């Protein structure tokens, strides 16, 4: 079982259970009542945000939805995979509320397409840069707790840096990301060099949207990530793509196909106005020298 497979298994199981419920023309409340659980609990099961699905609940749902023996066996197989604890659960004590779901999606994704207008994305941050940002959010953390938060962020980066089947990362950073001082000139110099080095990886495409490009979409665009999960042997998507957006007060997951396409179109417009990868590296290395 791969470190990221448990999240996909939970998502697939949730989808099949939702399809089964809708096929029986049952509401969440009606199906939940039949298994003596709350509607919110069943909704979390269908949305794959329950870390451990009880066998008794799965057995009851399979019977209610009239799944045959093969279908039920497949559901139980997915449940076993989904119940396996992934690496990030050891960081549960320092994991922001509900962020484990995003980390699971990120660890499962085959391709991540992201735009950041203000900060270096977590997957490309150096430990020092991450430490400054995390300290700002959690100023009361003790040394050990703070170190674990930084460790969690850096651990996520192995999805991009590992040798075996690393995910593809497409990133556009607005020039303001390079100009905004985080932690002082030494931290910024190291971060600029790290970005330049990461951009040489075959699975990473990093581009800078210069100030001179203005606002290609006519409006200011907030940060977003498009997560895609690859295809099976028949060329069918293993899981539908998801867009994740984050704001000061919370986050949002978007899955409607037309919405996903709008974000792809937005990214393409930004990409067409961004610098070429080779020019990006030259700029990043020049800025590293300036900060140093």
What is each residue range found by the language model?
Residues 1-80, 85:
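Basic, Lys/Arg-rich alpha-helical nucleic-acid-recognition elements, primarily the DNA-binding modules
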Residues 33-35, 93-95, 282-286:
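Short secondary-structure junction/hinge motifs that connect adjacent elements
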Residues 37, 45, 97, 104-107, ...:
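Short, functionally important structural connectors and interaction interfaces within domains
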Residues 73-107, 235:
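Short, charged recognition helix plus adjacent turn
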Residues 111-292:
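Hydrophobic protein-protein interaction segments
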């Amino acid at each position: 079982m791969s470190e990221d497979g448990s999240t996909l298994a939970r998502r697939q199981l949730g989808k099949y259970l939702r399809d089964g419920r809708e096929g029986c023309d049952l509401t969440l409340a009606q199906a939940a009542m039949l298994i003596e659980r709350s509607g919110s609990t069943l909704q979390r099961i269908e949305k794959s945000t329950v870390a451990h699905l009880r066998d008794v609940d799965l057995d009851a749902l399979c019977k209610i939805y009239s799944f045959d023996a093969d279908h039920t066996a497949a559901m139980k197989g997915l449940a076993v995979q989904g119940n396996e604890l992934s690496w990030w659960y050891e960081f549960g004590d320092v994991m922001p509320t509900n962020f484990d779901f995003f980390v699971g999606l990120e660890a499962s994704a085959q391709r991540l397409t992201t735009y950041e207008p203000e900060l270096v994305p977590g997957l490309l941050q150096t430990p020092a840069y991450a430490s400054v940002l995390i300290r700002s959010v959690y100023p009361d953390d003790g040394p050990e707790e703070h170190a674990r938060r930084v460790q969690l962020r850096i651990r996520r980066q192995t999805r991009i840096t590992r040798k075996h089947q690393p995910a593809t990362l497409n990133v556009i950073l607005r020039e303001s990301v390079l100009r905004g001082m985080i932690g002082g000139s030494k931290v910024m110099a190291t971060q600029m060099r790290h970005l330049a080095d990461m951009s040489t990886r075959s699975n990473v495409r990093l581009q800078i949207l210069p100030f001179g490009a203005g606002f290609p979409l006519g409006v200011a665009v907030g940060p977003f990530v498009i997560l895609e999960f690859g295809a099976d042997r028949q060329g069918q998507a293993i899981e539908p793509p998801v867009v994740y957006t984050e704001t000061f007060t919370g986050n949002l997951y978007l899955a409607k196909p037309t919405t996903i396409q709008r974000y792809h179109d937005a990214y393409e417009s930004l990409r067409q106005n961004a610098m070429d990868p080779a020019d990006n590296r030259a700029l990043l290395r020049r800025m590293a020298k300036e900060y140093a």
